[in-house]
Curated annotation (Swiss-Prot):
Any one biological process term the GO annotation gives: protein sumoylation
Keywords: Chromosome, DNA damage, DNA recombination, DNA repair, Nucleus, Phosphoprotein, Telomere
Species this protein is from: Homo sapiens (Human)
Principal subcellular localization: nucleus
Acidic residues: bias regions: 56-68
Modified residues (Phosphothreonine): T345
Region (Disordered): 1-69
Protein name as it appears in the record: Non-structural maintenance of chromosomes element 4 homolog A
Name of the encoding gene: NSMCE4A
Length: 385
């Protein structure tokens, strides 16, 4: 039994072991120790590295290797391309900085470098590569500025000696002979050269200028005859116009005088009617509206009020209020008028009231006026007839 038990002991222990625990121990033994730096990794690699699929999501293949995600493969390819572009940009910038003098002296070296940078810029898709491209453009602009400064700025300057040599050659004079003649200014050949040279120069310069036409007068006629002056026509004097203008004020004055005379006659006639009424019945006052209102004509009523105002102004009549607070009119006697002038107590007022057509109708209806007291004169009856 002991032998069996001892014989079964190892097998029993082997069967009683946990298989999951044995696999975990074997994996822990097979792992190699990692340094802290390798365990942490850089922050950039942790950001750029795609998420690894878990063991539960992946299915083991026949070979035992895990399947890779296509998105992670594409991201790694893009990172490799961007890394290569940055490397090429840095190499190009270093080359430009080292070969600065050669680029400034060579003719097309700067153009070639710019074309190479344009080729790299077509592949730029991130900000890091764009920053390198901007840095290269700063260097290229500085080089272009220096090459522009090296250009000659005196291209339009005037070379006097060259111009004189060309001018003497055009005149047919040898510059060496002309120099000897200039030294000897007293020789007659010098005067001939100077005079003849200016003559040739003048004929040459004449072809480059437009000729100015001579000035001549244009009389406006083909035959050149002067126009015959027209005879002066004397305008008639404006004497008749002045006479007519002088006659118009006289006519107006006569019309004004005639209207004034007619007004005075009408005022005297109305005053006579008022005095006749009071002479017949001196104790009964005359109502102002009964006296001036014409029930058949509103314009005549207005004229009567206008004429009565002159009678009141001159002091031949007066207006007062009766017991019913209605206006009445009565003539002023001669004795009262004389007393007023002596004591200087008479007040002159011109009684004019505003009267509308509606007021006139209401007065006629209220006072029951059927016939006018102031009958129209013959002058007023003619237009109506």
């Amino acid at each position: 039994m002991s032998g069996d038990s001892s014989g079964r002991g190892p097998e029993g222990r082997g069967r009683g072991r946990d298989p999951h625990r044995d696999r975990t121990r074997s994996r822990s033994r097979s792992r190699s120790p990692l340094s802290p730096r390798s365990r942490r990794g850089s922050a950039r690699e942790r950001r750029e590295a795609p998420e690894r699929p878990s063991l539960e999501d992946t299915e083991p293949s026949d070979s035992g290797d895990e399947m890779m995600d296509p998105a992670s493969l594409e991201a790694e390819a893009d990172q490799g391309l961007c890394r290569q572009i940055r490397h090429q940009y840095r190499a190009l910038i270093n080359s430009v900085q080292q070969n600065r003098e050669d680029i400034l002296n060579a003719g097309d070296k700067l153009t070639e470098v710019l074309e190479e940078a344009n080729t790299l810029f077509n592949e730029v898709s991130r900000a890091r590569e764009a920053v390198l491209d901007a840095h290269f453009l700063v260097l290229a602009s500085d080089l272009g500025k220096e090459k522009a400064k090296q250009l000659r700025s005196d291209l339009s300057s005037f070379d006097m000696l060259r111009y004189v040599e060309t001018l003497l050659t055009h005149m047919g004079v040898n510059p060496l002979e002309a120099e000897e003649l200039i030294r000897d200014e007293d020789s007659p050949d010098f005067e001939f050269i100077v005079y003849d040279s200016w003559k040739i120069t003048g004929r040459t310069a004449e072809n480059t200028f437009n000729k100015t036409h001579t000035f001549h007068f244009l009389l406006g006629s083909i035959y050149g005859e002067c126009p015959v002056p027209k005879p002066r026509v004397d305008r008639p004097r404006k004497v008749p116009v002045i006479q007519e203008e002088r006659a118009m004020p006289a006519q107006l004055r006569r019309m004004e005088e005639s209207h004034q005379e007619a007004t005075e006659k009408e005022v005297e006639r109305i005053l006579g009617l008022l005095q006749t009424y009071f002479r017949e019945d001196p104790d009964t006052p005359m109502s102002f509206f009964d006296f001036v209102v014409d029930p058949h004509s509103f314009p005549r009523t207005v004229e009567n009020i206008f004429h009565v105002s002159f009678i009141i102004r001159d002091g031949f009549a007066r207006i007062r209020l009766d017991q019913d607070r209605l206006p009445v009119i009565e003539p002023v006697s001669i004795n009262e008028e004389n007393e007023g002038f002596e004591h200087n107590t008479q007040v002159r007022n011109q009684g004019i009231i505003a009267l509308s057509y509606r007021d006139w109708e209401e007065i006629v209806k209220t006072f029951e006026i059927s016939e006018p007291v102031i009958t129209p004169s013959q002058r007023q009856q003619k237009p109506s007839a």
